[in-house]
């Protein structure tokens, strides 16, 4: 049944979109203010971004400890904001019964912010830390250089992020501009608010009316039109001028077809030639009929860039001549799949921007025509308009039912009625050839992963220590088809995948690079030395003969399980059971070589499986103090977090910090001081945490991941048991757990981009 949608305008001018989606477990709000960095005075670069930060520092009515961020985080929700060129977005997702509290805090902080000078001073340092990280990030600098190349007259080429020197806090003119920007743009006529959740439309409307009346009445302020966008010299960057309304949605359709890498498409042609290494398409700017978008294409060393560009122009011409109704029909099927798989937060954000998951309307089709006409074209290449991807089919694949392997556990924690299935397969690969052969499998699975991404199916192939893992999740029919194809590719990779691949993955900021290495670090195994050799299918066949596997499925109904049995007939390796969890003694420090110059550290403190409930509550109670002390008081940097995490089946406290000026040893001291300070049990926080582990309140993917991690830990996967354990956790339980964690002999893992600070840590370089 399609979602029920209601749109209306409130008395203060605020535009409201409400979406009732009964399948959702959570509710979300997304608020867009039609003003961004290009609308701020050019004299004060970063003013709009700075104001966005200040909103989150609390107000007299809702101080920081009870503000939107803490409120949402305490409920296990998501919250964030983003300042773009001509708009600023605020959004959060929470359990349905908490939507009103979140919306009240959001509207109050935006309508009546506290812009005190002392908090401005502190937050300016956070902005400056972001600026330093941005200036050191190669990817960010490449994009900035691209924007600067557009036009010297267009504001796209200017600096808008802000730093310590552009935000002149003690200049009266700056303070006047800051207050004036808020008064001019943060009023009803400038705001679009969307609410989305399982609640009836009338309830959503009541909540919206009750809180949105905080905004002053106003009319839409005409935003200054930018100068023209000149044509770009780059073959992969495109500018458009004077496009009709609906052009952003039309570009989404075009990119959806560009991302199709099956034979007969542009990416398919590049892949057939062995040239394609990596591809992403990104809309960089859209406003007042202007569009700027870019194709980030990485080709092999032997590729011909001119031929790749010529093929692209040939494909543009083909799409321009294709039946647009047929294009739109297939796009509609893709959008329907995306909408069904989207979270409440994704749906609300799309609604707030006027870009719901839907096919093009009449205006959008006209915009598509104008967009295609403004693209270069050539009579070059052999192209096809392909049929609908089978991954979008809702019916189960036809196959003779087969019994499920004994190595596959069936979890009952995710009801089939959710229409979300997850499958985890894990292989123990002791062979020294696992690392080079892993790269072969990564290349083999890449085209299928691209198709899965388009069809809103998760397909992830990963490794940790001596283990390979395949994870697939989404609509049950799509999961079955994707897994069957994935296993076939893992058994017999195409010939092109055996060639050496020299493409490097995109560089990550230090803290994200450490998070990527964390599973390997927990496993504690270094990759074996492998002599250079030519890889062959025979080596892979031999590897599979000496490999053991086990897995877990969740969310499949009986008929789908029978089809899953057929799909797993070709699962390589011998069935087994989960391996013992990794363990280590005392404090272990791992020095990771990652790109970037900022100090970064992850501290992982494992806990016994029986202490999961107390550990989760302890992590919840530490989250606020960690953020307050490290991010707000000490201003170590903008990347600060703490949480309970399960990694390779091992549950524990995880702390992460990236700082441009405070080294790892100092960060560690601050964390230890926080732990020594202890926590005080808050019954309300305990109740809220327990509520997060009620299946109807958990995201489907989170239920499946929790069940899998619990399976790896060889524990019983019962959410009701975890909830009861949380509710019965006492202050003494938390005190004893903290005392055990602080014992010098406790098993800690510190993963950092620096050497151990002293000999109390057992060091290791990677």
Curated annotation (Swiss-Prot):
Superkingdom in the source lineage: Bacteria
GO BP: any one term: pyrroloquinoline quinone biosynthetic process
Pathway: Cofactor biosynthesis; pyrroloquinoline quinone biosynthesis
Cofactor note: Binds 1 zinc ion per subunit.
Protease in keyword set: yes
CC cofactor: Zn(2+)
Residues of the active site: 52
Enzyme Commission no: 3.4.24.-
Keyword terms of this UniProt record: Hydrolase, Metal-binding, Metalloprotease, PQQ biosynthesis, Protease, Zinc
Function description: Required for coenzyme pyrroloquinoline quinone (PQQ) biosynthesis. It is thought that this protein is a protease that cleaves peptides bond in a small peptide (gene pqqA), providing the glutamate and tyrosine residues which are necessary for the synthesis of PQQ.
Protein name, entry field: Coenzyme PQQ synthesis protein F
Provenance organism: Pseudomonas putida (strain ATCC 47054 / DSM 6125 / CFBP 8728 / NCIMB 11950 / KT2440)
């Amino acid at each position: 049944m399609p979602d029920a949608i209601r749109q209306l305008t409130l008395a203060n001018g605020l535009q409201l979109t409400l979406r009732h989606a009964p399948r959702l477990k959570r509710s979300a709000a997304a608020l867009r203010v039609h003003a961004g960095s290009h609308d701020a005075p050019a004299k004060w670069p970063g003013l709009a971004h700075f104001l966005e930060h200040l909103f989150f520092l609390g107000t007299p009515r809702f101080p920081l400890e009870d503000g939107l961020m803490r409120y949402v985080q305490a409920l296990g929700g998501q919250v964030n904001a983003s300042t773009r060129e001509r708009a600023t977005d605020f959004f959060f997702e929470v359990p349905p019964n908490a939507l009103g509290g979140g919306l009240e805090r959001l509207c109050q902080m935006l309508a009546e912010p506290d812009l005190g000078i002392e908090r401005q001073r502190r937050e300016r340092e956070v902005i400056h830390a972001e600026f330093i990280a941005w200036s050191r990030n190669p990817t960010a600098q490449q994009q900035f250089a691209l924007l600067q190349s557009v036009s010297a007259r267009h504001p796209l080429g200017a600096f808008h992020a802000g730093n310590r020197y552009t935000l002149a806090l003690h200049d009266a003119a700056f303070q006047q501009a800051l207050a004036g920007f808020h008064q001019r743009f943060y009023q009803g006529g400038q705001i679009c608010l969307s609410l989305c959740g399982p609640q009836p439309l009338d309830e959503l409307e009541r909540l919206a009316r009750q809180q949105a009346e905080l905004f002053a009445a106003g009319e839409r302020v005409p935003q200054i039109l930018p100068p023209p966008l000149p044509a770009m010299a780059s073959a992969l960057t495109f500018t458009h001028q004077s496009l009709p309304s609906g052009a952003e949605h039309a570009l989404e359709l075009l990119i959806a077809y560009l991302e199709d890498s099956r034979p007969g498409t542009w990416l398919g042609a590049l892949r057939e030639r062995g040239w394609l290494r990596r591809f992403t398409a990104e809309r960089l700017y859209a406003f007042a009929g202007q569009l700027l978008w870019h194709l980030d294409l990485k080709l092999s060393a032997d590729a011909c860039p001119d031929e790749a560009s010529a093929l692209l122009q040939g494909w543009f011409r083909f799409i321009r001549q294709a039946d647009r109704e047929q294009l739109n029909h297939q796009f509609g099927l893709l959008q329907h799949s995306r909408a069904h798989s989207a979270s409440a937060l994704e749906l609300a954000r799309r609604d707030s921007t006027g870009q719901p998951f839907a096919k093009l309307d009449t205006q959008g089709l006209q915009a598509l025509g104008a967009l295609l006409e403004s693209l270069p074209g050539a009579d070059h290449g052999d192209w096809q308009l392909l049929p609908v991807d089978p991954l979008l089919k809702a019916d189960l694949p036809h196959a003779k039912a087969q019994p499920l392997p004994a190595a596959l556990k069936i979890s009952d924690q995710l009801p089939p009625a959710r229409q979300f299935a997850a499958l985890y397969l894990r292989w123990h690969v002791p062979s020294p050839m696992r690392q080079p052969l892993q790269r072969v499998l990564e290349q083999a699975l890449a085209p299928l992963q691209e198709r899965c991404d388009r069809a809103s199916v998760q397909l992830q192939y990963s490794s940790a220590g001596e283990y390979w893992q395949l994870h697939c999740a989404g609509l049950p029919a799509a999961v079955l088809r994707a897994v069957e194809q994935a296993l076939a590719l893992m058994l017999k990779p195409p010939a092109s995948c055996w060639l050496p691949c020299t493409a490097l993955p995109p560089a990550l900021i230090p803290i994200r690079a450490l998070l990527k290495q964390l599973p390997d670090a927990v496993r504690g195994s270094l990759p074996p030395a492998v002599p250079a050799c030519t890889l062959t299918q025979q080596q892979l066949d031999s590897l599979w003969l000496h490999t053991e596997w086990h897995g877990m499925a969740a969310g499949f109904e009986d008929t789908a399980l029978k089809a899953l049995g057929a799909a797993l007939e070709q699962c390589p390796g011998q069935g087994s059971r989960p391996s013992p969890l990794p363990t280590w003694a005392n404090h272990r420090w791992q020095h990771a070589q990652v790109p970037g110059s900022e100090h970064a550290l992850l501290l992982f403190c494992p806990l016994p499986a029986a202490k999961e409930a107390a550990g989760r509550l302890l992590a919840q109670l530490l989250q606020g103090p960690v953020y307050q002390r490290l991010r707000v008081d000490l201003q170590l940097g903008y990347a600060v977090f703490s949480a309970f995490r399960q990694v390779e089946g091992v549950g524990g406290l995880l702390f992460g910090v990236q700082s441009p000026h405070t080294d790892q040893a100092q960060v560690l001291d601050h964390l230890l001081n926080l732990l020594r300070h202890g926590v005080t049990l808050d019954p309300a926080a305990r109740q809220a945490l327990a509520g997060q582990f009620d299946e109807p309140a958990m995201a489907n993917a989170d239920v499946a991941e929790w069940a899998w991690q619990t399976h790896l830990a060889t524990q019983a996967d019962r959410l009701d048991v975890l909830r009861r354990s949380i509710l019965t956790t006492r202050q003494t339980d938390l005190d004893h757990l903290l005392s055990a964690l602080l014992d010098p002999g406790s098993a800690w893992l510190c993963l950092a981009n620096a050497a151990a600070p002293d000999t109390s840590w057992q060091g290791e370089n990677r």
